[in-house]
A protein has these predicted regions:
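N-terminal signal peptide c-region/cleavage motif recognized by signal peptidases
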Residues: 15-17
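Positively charged n-region of N-terminal signal peptides that target proteins for export
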Residues: 1-4
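Hydrophobic small-molecule pocket/channel-lining residues, especially in calycin-type beta-barrels
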Residues: 19-228
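Sec-dependent N-terminal signal peptides
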Residues: 6-10
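Low-complexity, intrinsically disordered segments with a bias for serine/threonine
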Residues: 12-13, 23
Length: 228
């Protein structure tokens, strides 16, 4: 009887981790631009946005992710999610990013960034994260962000005070993400972003091999427009 009880206890612990996994695992592509709530910035947030220059301040120019939301929202870039018994692994094609997120509570949160590229460079702009399940929904909490931009097109900022939650679930065959940013120093109310993704038949993401970018093409286009 003791042996049966022991086996049952072990199964409750380990099988629970397996049973909590969902259909989130797979390779996904963004479906359209998504939606966002009204952006209500504090005076500090407004100042950062006003000072932002896309052609100078976009971290993408140096192959650096501006934020987690910026990477989720990149069109035509594969994203692979792998659910393990003790962690979530997310591979983003953009910038060859690899995100390792331990499963548990905030006691498993590391001071180090959760994301690195294939060369091993860590990116604090993506924060430090841990994850847990609520039913069929995967919840990712992220803290310890370096300054960056939630929206690079408009300079919507994040800061070391930023707290982010990603709620990820599959509905009707599509992956849905509700991404909530809270930061009292930057936002009067939380900023909520929503995206959907379609599953594709692929085993992995492609290699991006980023090199430092520039906006020369954009400047040339503007110069041509000005001369017309």
């Amino acid at each position: 009887m003791k042996t049966v009880a022991f086996i049952s206890s072990v199964c409750l612990f380990f099988c629970g981790s397996v049973f909590s996994q969902t259909s989130i695992s797979g390779v996904w592509l963004l479906n359209g631009p998504g939606t966002e709530s009204a952006i209500q910035l504090t005076p500090l947030g407004e100042q950062i946005r006003a000072d932002y220059d896309l052609l100078e301040d976009d971290p993408s120019l140096s192959c650096t992710p501006a934020s987690v939301s910026r990477i989720w929202a990149n069109p035509n870039s594969r994203i692979k999610i792998t659910e393990q018994t003790d962690a979530i692994e997310i591979s983003y094609e953009l910038f060859d990013l690899r995100r390792h997120i331990p499963l548990g509570d905030d006691s498993v949160l590391s001071d180090s960034p959760s994301t690195r590229n294939l060369s091993g460079t860590l990116f604090a702009e993506m924060g430090s994260s841990f994850a847990f399940y609520e039913g069929a929904t995967l919840i990712i909490e992220s803290r310890n962000h370096a300054p960056g931009y939630i929206r690079t097109s408009r300079g919507i900022p994040q800061s070391p005070n930023t707290f982010a939650i990603e709620e990820i679930e599959v509905r009707d065959g599509e992956l849905h993400i509700t991404h909530t940013y809270r930061d009292g120093s930057l936002f009067e109310v939380p900023l909520v972003l929503e995206y959907s993704f379609r599953r594709i038949e692929a085993e992995d993401v492609d290699i991006y091999s980023c090199t430092d970018a520039d906006y020369d093409w954009f400047l040339e286009l503007n110069n041509k427009s000005d001369s017309n």
